[in-house]
A protein has these predicted regions:
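N-terminal accessory segment detector
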Residues: 1-137
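Short, hydrophobic/π-rich interface segment
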Residues: 138-189
Length: 196
């Protein structure tokens, strides 16, 4: 465990904020103020872009773990609330896709570059929580596997399948990849494909 902030902690915090902003985008589109306030009271948002302002430096790992859990559970809670209100998954996916299109254009010259971009953006728990690896790489396709799906526990807590999360993730990444003419597909919840 680290006793001081290192680049990996800022990298993780950026990923947490990206996930939180997706939740906010969905909330803004579909929830009224009272419903947003309820989500905030149950699962308070991180209020600063500056990690040093908010983190408990005496418990860096524990604080980051709690922040990951909080952003994941809030997202699952909001999605369940929307589905219960009759908002279609397709409509929620449109918001996720649009959020993906808001990212700046990065230097992507290969499928490996696209994969590395995803590793910098997607929140899959702390590095100690998950193992992700490329299992197949060809000229026009790169397949990777997520060995420990941390999202499942949060969606299951609200009686949803992890596949709901992965459909939303697919929409978000396809929004992100639109400017590169790349596609992202869930083969199954644990296997992902990036293709030209």
């Amino acid at each position: 465990m680290s006793a001081f902030l290192a680049p990996i902690h800022f990298w993780m915090y950026d990923k947490i904020l990206i996930a939180q902003k997706l939740t906010f985008a969905v909330e803004e589109k579909f929830l009224n103020k009272e419903e947003r306030d309820e989500a905030e009271s149950l699962f308070p948002a991180l209020i600063s872009e500056d990690l040093e302002e908010v983190i408990d430096q005496s418990n860096i790992h524990g604080w980051l773990h709690t922040a990951v859990s909080n952003v994941e559970i809030r997202f699952a809670y909001v999605i369940k609330k929307l589905l219960d209100k009759g908002i279609s998954l397709e409509d929620i996916k449109k918001v996720a896709f649009e959020y993906g299109t808001t990212f700046p254009k990065y230097e992507i010259s290969s499928l490996q570059d696209a994969y590395e971009l995803l590793m910098d953006i997607l929140l899959d728990g702390l590095p100690c929580d998950v193992s992700i690896s490329v299992i197949r790489e060809e000229e026009n396709e790169l397949e990777f596997v997520l060995y420990n799906d941390i999202h499942k526990q949060y969606f299951n807590e609200f009686d949803m399948e992890a596949s709901v999360y992965h459909e939303l993730r697919e929409a978000f990444v396809n929004g992100l990849f639109e400017k590169y003419s790349l596609k992202y597909k869930n083969i199954i919840d644990s296997n992902k494909l990036i293709s030209r």
